[in-house]
Amino acid sequence: MWKLKIAEGGSPWLRTVNNHVGRQVWEFDPKLGSPEDLLEIEKARQNFHDNRFTHKHSADLLMRIHFAKENPMNEVLPKVRVKDIEDVTEETVKTTLRRAINFHSTLQSHDGHWPGDYGGPMFLMPGLVITLSITGALNAVLTEEHRKEICRYLYNHQNKDGGWGLHIEGPSTMFGSVLNYVALRLLGEGPNDRQGEMEKGRDWILGHGGATFITSWGKMWLSVLGVYEWSGNNPLPPEIWLLPYVLPIHPGRMWCHCRMVYLPMSYLYGKRFVGPITPTILSLRKELYTIPYHDIDWNQARNLCAKEDLYYPHPLVQDILWASLHKFLEPILMHWPGKKLREMAIKTAIEHIHYEDDNTRYLCIGPVNKVLNMLCCWVEDPNSEAFKLHLPRIYDYLWIAEDGMKMQGYNGSQLWDTAFTAQAIISSNLIEEYGPTLRKAHTYIKNSQVLEDCPGDLSKWYRHISKGAWPFSTADHGWPISDCTAEGLKAVLLLSKIAPEIVGEPLDAKRLYDAVNVILSLQNEDGGFATYELTRSYTWLELINPAETFGDIVIDYPYVECTSAAIQALTSFKKLYPGHRREEIQCCIEKAASFIEKTQASDGSWYGSWGVCFTYGTWFGVKGLIAAGKSFNNCSSIRKACEFLLSKQLPSGGWGESYLSCQNKVYSNVESNRSHVVNTGWAMLALIDAEQAKRDPTPLHRAAVYLINSQMENGDFPQQEIMGVFNKNCMITYAAYRNVFPIWALGEYRHRVLQSQ
């Protein structure tokens, strides 16, 4: 049976700044689990498999089974059902809240955070499998049980047509189909294994033109593996790292996720590295293409991309740029004397790779550059300490649920989920009852603040200050983020108002000042806040976005969510510490509020870039403006936002927005106009904040009916469609949202609507 280990090290090759707080790793123990446990797990797996085409999202049941043993519930209060809004009383809401928080508290780990599934993208695991296969570490790192669960996951998320999507709910793409087919082959599956699944996968690939039509990221992965030629790639010259920083196209000016992925890619491209050519590789060269491998026109293949993958088609200027670099510059850099420059660029690239590895304790900023950096360290020296330090950190990215083992989009969402959960529980006003839960959450948040800047000259490494920030996941990861810092600060400020004998000692004021300093340092000239850093270049740089699958990746754009979170945190801070940097904070809030007003769409919504979608963005838009001192009466933006939200309420009383809203930028309901507990939570929170109850509380009562009746027998809420997103087009799982936002919305509803009536 699989066991979730929390905050444990266990390897001499692991480094940590805070004793591994927040680390979550699944380990298989053959001796663990009674026959009843194993039967329950098998039932969950079979149930997922049988319904995989209608319910594509797992419900994180293995973790729930694990915690039911570790943190059993003392009592399960009887479920409440309400027929109509007349049945919604303070007592029914309180019971629903207690049932929900009782259950959610059992999912809290001993270090105070809420673990959970952060999977969703389907292009992450293949990168890991390819890297481990090339380096010969596949069987050493992934046990037979790991490999079995990874195969289960890949087969479970194969679409009916035989292909694989960009993410678990998406239609088949060439990027997803080729990479997942290749991953299965490298994991030991034969070309005709299973009940025709491999054949169906191959038929989808060949029926859509073959692997020459894969996206640029896919071309790079296939090239290092040896099943595609480097000459079929558009150039990724490492020399870009030698350009002066003053140029707008310098990678140091790009969004950190973008530059940190293209950094190791440029190293591998500069070296034209190809892994060992094995019989499986030779076989894949035959399996993936519609014509013999040696007959492929690689120059023509450079710009081929399947229409299913084409979210961001290359503008003409990009095709001209890549063709010029490919034809004229690359031949010079591949031969003496130009080769000297190439060697210098490769040396610079690997220095930046090592800096990133060292300062994230070998977690790296995300899963894509994690495995690429690991491969680069092996290419530089297969016996290097750096490669060995990378290996144990692979497990930080692996998560298992009833659909199998997946690679997550980060090493988890620990701080983010814990900060939200603390705010949600506090909103319920049941603070004393859940004091132990809040105390543990408080401890986790305090232990996860980043206490130092990265070492050395930050400008040399293109890094922003970190001291005082909160990361998305763990202190070991350490990359500072504007909204994570804001949500962390909001949570500790709320907790500081509660008696320390209930929730523990408050955070030292100096550490609060450090957090405020980070937030203030991240405001752009237009008043908006981007994610990790300031916006360092121009939007026209998107013209050279080479990733056909993703939108808006080249620079760190300002977002309504980050801007709103910053306003909320600074407003909360200002109330408790009115003397600290008062004028700067006030000026920052005013500029940020003006940015939010400017970015509102004509229909009253805001586009959400990190959650689905207009419901999420509009919750942040409204919350930010209200925190800045505006109200329904004096702000037309808030009035329009309320109108927008009310126009989307469904007959069931809830809201339900599809991920299609994100990619198409047009509001779309979930299929069959079903409501969703998470969207409903966001919409309720926005409307309650905008004092909807004073005008007409009926929409809020109807939403409360939907949430109360959605609660499951054990106090959990159902896992519905996927609710997280990044880069406009790729969806990601936030497993805790189904619990956090119904709790938060009903908590606010109880004390700001029912108790104030």
Swiss-Prot record:
Catalytic reaction annotation: (S)-2,3-epoxysqualene = cycloartenol
GO cellular component terms, A-Z: lipid droplet
Highest taxon of the lineage: Eukaryota
UniProt note on tissues of expression: Expressed in thickened roots and root nodules.
Induction / repression: No effect of methyl jasmonate (MeJA) or gibberellin A3 (GA3).
Species for this entry: Glycyrrhiza glabra
Name recorded for this polypeptide: Cycloartenol synthase
Listed InterPro entries: SQ_cyclase_C, SQ_cyclase_N, Squalene_cyclase, Terpene_synthase_CS, Terpenoid_cyclase/PrenylTrfase
Positions annotated as active site in the UniProt record: D483
